Amino acid sequence: MKKITTVLALFVVALFTSCNNQQTLQEYLVASQEKNGFITVDIPINFIKPKSLDVSDDVKETIKSIRKVNLVALPYQGNEEAYETEKETLNTILKTNDKYKSLMRMNTQGIKMNIYFTGSADAIDEVIAFGYAKDKGVGVARILGEDMDPSKIIDMMNNITVDGDGLNLKKFNLAF
């Protein structure tokens, strides 16, 4: 009887310590679709096209490895109070979850940008770009794929265009 009680107690402890109440990026993206002031777009993969017909096979292969692209932004103007809250929420999600590894940070034209990834360094499954600027707003872009090569992703980004007809991507000019 003592063994059963010990095993049951260990199970209960394991159950409670394994529960994680941290919000995930996926939960944040879904919740943002319902929040006032947010701009959200899910870009269908068939909208991502090579800039020209003579792009490398690596670019074509990288495009094929992408499954989903999500964009979420909150323009600063008119959302001053929510800006700080949302910036801190995203910072917390990305910095406290061991799943997200920092790839690089940059500061360009007053926009602070952090790039994160999941997977291994040579086979990335997810790329997250998180940026913010006090006069622009806060936003996050997520590319989901399968075994993406970081150097090929950069090459691809320089060689693609997004067919924005029907997506109304101009609304992102408000934020960035």
Give each language-model segment a name.
Residues K2-A9:
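Sec-dependent signal peptide recognition
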Residues L15-S18:
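C-terminal motif of bacterial Sec signal peptides marking the signal peptidase cleavage site
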Residues N20-Q23:
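Bacterial signal peptide processing site
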Residues Q26-L90:
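Early exported N-terminus immediately downstream of N-terminal targeting peptides
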Residues E34-K60, K99-Y116, G166, N173:
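Generic detector of solvent-exposed, compositionally biased contiguous segments
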Residues L74-I115, G119-D122:
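Mid-length scaffold segments of soluble, non-membrane domains
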Residues S120-D149:
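A short, solvent-exposed beta-edge/loop patch
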Residues E146-F176:
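C-terminal partner/receptor-binding element of secreted or periplasmic proteins
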